[in-house]
Regions:
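Acidic-leaning, charged glycine-interspersed low-complexity segments
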Residues: 72-108
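Long, highly charged amphipathic alpha-helices
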Residues: 8, 12, 69, 73-77
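Oligomerization/assembly interface segments of phage tail-like spikes and tubes
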Residues: 53-65, 99-108
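Residues that cap or flank secondary-structure elements
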Residues: 1, 65-66
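Glycine-rich loops and low-complexity Gly/Arg-rich segments
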Residues: 45-48, 59-63, 83-87
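Short active-site-adjacent helix-start/loop capping segments
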Residues: 44, 68-69
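Short coil/turn motifs at beta-sheet boundaries
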Residues: 29, 50-54, 96-98
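Small/polar-rich, solvent-exposed N-terminal microdomains that initiate assembly or binding
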Residues: 1-49
Length: 108
């Protein structure tokens, strides 16, 4: 992953003040490493009342999943932005022969 891409990710994380996130990657190399974040967004309804909705943002980071240096860096960014994260669960998705492991991170 290029340094420019990493800078964009850091900027995106800071801008969105992400509350929680999880990371996912494909078991095949060089497929997207994705940071998904869910944040609560305030909206004003037509009648003037305030409502809140959940918004999910996906930030794509391309790199070889065996590149542990980048993995550590992405996790460091998440920890710095969102506080400490613990893996709270995993889910396995099979789609067109690609097995994906999704790790859910919840604020400790």
């Amino acid at each position: 992953m290029s340094k420019t891409k990493l800078k964009e990710v850091i900027e995106e994380l800071k801008n969105n003040k992400i509350a929680c996130a999880h990371l996912s990657y494909s078991t095949r190399q060089n497929l997207p490493y994705v940071i998904w974040s869910t944040d609560e967004v305030e909206c004003t309804c037509a009648d003037g009342s305030i409502a809140y909705k959940e918004e999910t943002i996906a930030l794509e980071v391309y790199y070889n999943k065996n590149d542990t240096k980048t993995t550590d860096k992405v996790e460091e960014i998440l920890n710095a932005t969102c506080g400490t994260y613990d893996t709270s669960g995993e889910i396995y998705i099979e789609d067109e022969g690609v097995c994906e492991v999704i790790y859910y991170f919840a604020s400790a």
